[in-house]
Structures are given as C-alpha cells and as structure tokens.
Amino acid sequence: MTKLNFKVFLLAMSFLSMHAFAETESKSTDAYSVCVDETIQELGLGNINNAVVDICSHKTKTLYAKQIVQVLDQIKKQSQEYQQPERYSDIMKSQQLWKSFVEQECRNAGAYIGSPMYEYCPMQKYGERLEQLQEYLN
C-alpha cells in the first residue's frame, strides 16, 4: 500500500508543479493547459482527473507530432539550400533513435509512476523535441 501511496503522491506533485509553472512553460504546455481547462468545463468537472489528462495529453502530442513533421520538412529544405544533405540525414537518424527512447522512457514512467504517464510523458517529450528541432533551424 505504501508503494501505491508514493506513486499517487508523485503523480499529484507532477500535476501540481505543472499547473504552478504554467505561465513560465513554453507553448507546449500552453496547448495542454488550454485543453485541460476546456475539457474540465465541457465535462462539467470540478478538477482534473485521469480521463482529462489522457484526452489532453493525446490531443497535444498529436499537435506536436504534426509540428515536428513541419519542422523536419523545413530542416530538409534548409539542408538542401545549404547543400548539406548529411545534416538532414543525421537529424533523421537521431529522430528515429529519439522515438525509440521516448517509447521506452514513457513505458517506464507509466509502469513506475502511474497510468496517466503513458500519455502525459510522450506529450512532454514531443514538446521538448519540437523546441529542440526548432533550434536547429536558427
């Protein structure tokens, strides 16, 4: 029972810290926060619950995945313009490795922290990756 309480505590702290720092977070958290607020209101809930986390994490991750594809397309164009095909090739190799890492890391988070992490963790990682790839354009 103590292990379960610890997991619940960690999960609660994750959500509380996310909301406490929402204004300082990047665009990635903003999309999630907006979804959470709208979903809570639409469903007439008093607070966030696992279903809201699941819905909004999935929605936001899907948004980031589309944006990542757009940024990768821009990197490809830029690499062609600069005649650096190896740059794009290297980034695509790291992208495949990154996807494998995220899948395993988030499976671990779901198993050890709790089921909401199966969707919340990938959303966080996709937001971070989007920001990282955008830096490659500058």
Task: Explain the meaning of each model-derived region.
Residues 9-15:
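Hydrophobic helical h-region of N-terminal Sec-dependent signal peptides
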Residues 22-138:
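N-terminal alpha-helical modules
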Residues 17-19:
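N-terminal signal peptide c-region/cleavage motif recognized by signal peptidases
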Residues 1-9:
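Bacterial N-terminal signal peptides that target proteins for export
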